[in-house]
Structures are given as structure tokens and as C-alpha cells.
Amino acid sequence: APASGFFGMR
């Protein structure tokens, strides 16, 4: 779930 990581960074 790479998308989760992107959202977490933001």
C-alpha cells in the first residue's frame, strides 16, 4: 500500500 505512505508524508 504505497499510496498510504504518500498520504502519510503529506
Swiss-Prot record:
Judging by the UniProt lineage, the source's domain of life is: Eukaryota
In its record, the post-translational modification comment is: Tachykinin-related peptide 3(3-10) occurs in two forms, Rhopr-TRP-3(3-10) has unmodified Met-9 and Ox-Rhopr-TRP-3(3-10) has oxidation at Met-9.
Cite a GO CC annotation: extracellular region
Q: Which GO terms describe its biological process?
A: neuropeptide signaling pathway
Where Methionine sulfoxide occurs along the chain? 9
The primary location reported for this protein is: secreted
Q: Which UniProt keywords apply?
A: Amidation, Neuropeptide, Oxidation, Secreted
Q: Where in the cell is it found?
A: Secreted
Residue list for modification Arginine amide = 10
Does this UniProt record's set of keywords contain Secreted? yes
What this protein is reported to do is described as:
Myoactive peptide. Increases the amplitude and frequency of spontaneous contractions and tonus of hindgut muscle.
Q: What's the protein name?
A: Tachykinin-related peptide 3
Q: What is the lineage of its organism?
A: Eukaryota, Metazoa, Ecdysozoa, Arthropoda, Hexapoda
